[in-house]
Amino acid sequence: MRKMSFASKSLVLLLSIFAARGADKNAPFKPGPTESYPCRQTQEKVTVAVQPFDTEEKTRLAFDKLDPNRYGVLPVLVIIRNDGPSTLMLDGLRVEYLTESRQKVEAIPSREVAKVNAPGRPHISGGPLPTQIPRSSTKKNPLTNWTIEGRAFAAKALPSGESASGFFYFEARHRSGAALYLTGLREAPSRRELFYFEIPLDAALDGR
């Protein structure tokens, strides 16, 4: 019998969460623990796990019928677990998507995601975006869906022993060889900045 890869097991876990939510459409999206994701890294007792939501099957878990990828927006789930002794300050957290060619794509503030679908806005992508991206007025723009801002990463501080999670959004198409780059995590008492996190995302592709 062929064994399932860790990434495949993670996708099954995500799908089981979605199935459990099926009976209650208003139930909040709840990601799994950091150790359930294959793309993760631990430094100084802080673990960061990430999961690109690059398929319709995955986006349905958090955004229901909306697939932001259809409109040129890649959602990436970020979970941060603080097992250190001090509270972490996240107000200066910076998250960038590194393409396979090492091009840095900055995260789009959640309140500005809808502008990606506005006519005339230049694209900054990690590879060709899907052709014939739907264009619509702001009023009917599907990216104005409440889930975009409602699911966004919003934590500004993270006490010891706790986790925080949410989505960051990038104008990019997910491809093999990409990574997520995080900087700006600081210890609250000293304001000392932790070492950066660079997390390869290829393990997530194995779970498709």
What label would you give each PLM region?
Residues 22-208:
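Conserved functional micro-motifs across diverse proteins
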Residues 1-11:
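Bacterial N-terminal signal peptides that target proteins for export
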Residues 13-22:
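Hydrophobic h-region of N-terminal signal peptides that target proteins for export
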